[in-house]
């Protein structure tokens, strides 16, 4: 139960940070481009790489610390960082084809799913 609380707390913190970046970018750059989303995806991807290396591998931090920081905070900040880590992990294991498939399938199918969800939502009423 403590693990769920750690992930939930971290997720709440990450979500608030994502919201604040969105507000800040909207005020700074306006609504014509999703700068906030781009920023959290890039920063989140950098941070997940840094934290996995430092917290998990070098500092040998507890599973609770990893759950809070990586799954919780960064998961709440951006799920794109998890996607990026999974793709790089496959690549580093030598599964180049599987990594490429994962990247393409994730992007193409996710975008198609958004279109499908929009279409369904628009046709329900």
Curated annotation (Swiss-Prot):
Na(+) is not transported, but it plays an essential structural role and its presence is essential for fluoride channel function. The keyword Transmembrane helix applies. Belongs to the fluoride channel Fluc/FEX (TC 1.A.43) family. This is Fluoride-specific ion channel FluC. It is found in: Cell inner membrane. Keywords: Cell inner membrane, Cell membrane, Ion channel, Ion transport, Membrane, Metal-binding, Sodium, Transmembrane, Transmembrane helix, Transport. One of its GO terms (biological process) is cellular detoxification of fluoride. It catalyses: fluoride(in) = fluoride(out). The gene is fluC. Na(+) binds at residues 75, 78. It comes from Agrobacterium fabrum (strain C58 / ATCC 33970). InterPro entries: FluC. It is a multi-pass membrane protein. It comes from the Bacteria. One of its GO terms (cellular component) is plasma membrane. One of its GO terms (molecular function) is metal ion binding. Pfam families: CRCB. Fluoride-specific ion channel. Important for reducing fluoride concentration in the cell, thus reducing its toxicity. The chain crosses the membrane at residues 4-24, 35-55, 68-88, 100-120.
């Amino acid at each position: 139960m403590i693990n769920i609380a750690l992930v939930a707390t971290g997720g709440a913190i990450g979500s608030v940070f994502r919201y604040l970046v969105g507000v800040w970018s909207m005020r700074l750059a306006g609504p014509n481009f999703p700068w906030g989303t781009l920023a959290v995806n890039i920063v989140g991807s950098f941070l997940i790489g840094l934290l996995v290396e430092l917290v998990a591998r070098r500092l040998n931090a507890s599973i609770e610390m990893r759950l809070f920081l990586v799954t919780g905070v960064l998961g709440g900040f951006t799920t794109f960082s998890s996607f990026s880590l999974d793709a790089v992990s496959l690549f580093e294991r030598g599964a180049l084809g599987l990594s490429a498939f994962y990247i393409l399938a994730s992007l193409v199918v996710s975008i198609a799913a958004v279109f499908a969800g929009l279409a369904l939502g628009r046709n329900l009423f």
